[in-house]
Amino acid sequence: MASNGESKHSEVGHKSLLQSDALYQYILETSVYPREPEAMKELREVTAKHPWNLMTTSADEGQFLNMLLKLINAKNTMEIGVYTGYSLLATALALPDDGKILAMDINRENYEIGLPIIEKAGVGHKIDFREGPALPVLDHMLEDGKYHGTFDFVFVDADKDNYINYHKRLIDLVKIGGLIGYDNTLWNGSVAQPADAPMRKYVRYYRDFVIELNKALAADPRIEICMLPVGDGVTLCRRIS
């Protein structure tokens, strides 16, 4: 069991950008964990045992997404990048019983880790899971025509080198007034560090892609944006035209 704030942080909040581990732990223990649905807690604990657990959405971000979806009365949503399904479950629990989520990931095996928990929570019927790259699916939807402006919310937590390619397509699929959420837009804090600063190899590899995305979103007149230091940074884009 963790014996100090730093080790606790590495266990339960590895994506927090807060400077104080104790403060992040306070947020989790005071506001997040006491209100976390039992199914989300179970999935979080199962995911923590997975060797790629760094890929999961943090508990505080899951709580934020769940609240956000309720506030905008979302019903038709999309998620690109699912992993074990923690953020997907947060979404499914927030949607009405007839709500729908188009969920895409290249690895169904990871999704199936969380699927029994999702089904036990009674929300599996809301999810249409597609295994494989998302870009061809998005292109097909755009070509079809009937999906234009139909999504209330889209959450992207996938390959950072394709975020701009996703945005080019999603902007036409989300409705006017709808939201797109891009995860990891502060990318371990590396976006504010010099290019030659020491950082992990995978962080360095995707850093420039994230920086370019942030610049592109800030310059896009079709959206209003809000970058939040939740989890590893999430940027909300509200389509206005």
Curated annotation (Swiss-Prot):
Keywords: Lignin biosynthesis, Metal-binding, Methyltransferase, S-adenosyl-L-methionine, Transferase. One of its GO terms (biological process) is lignin biosynthetic process. It catalyses: (E)-caffeoyl-CoA + S-adenosyl-L-methionine = (E)-feruloyl-CoA + S-adenosyl-L-homocysteine + H(+). This is Caffeoyl-CoA O-methyltransferase. Binds 1 divalent metal cation per subunit. Pathway: Aromatic compound metabolism; phenylpropanoid biosynthesis. It comes from Petroselinum crispum. Substrate binds at K15, D157, N188. The modification Blocked amino end (Met) is found at M1. Belongs to the class I-like SAM-binding methyltransferase superfamily. Cation-dependent O-methyltransferase family. CCoAMT subfamily.
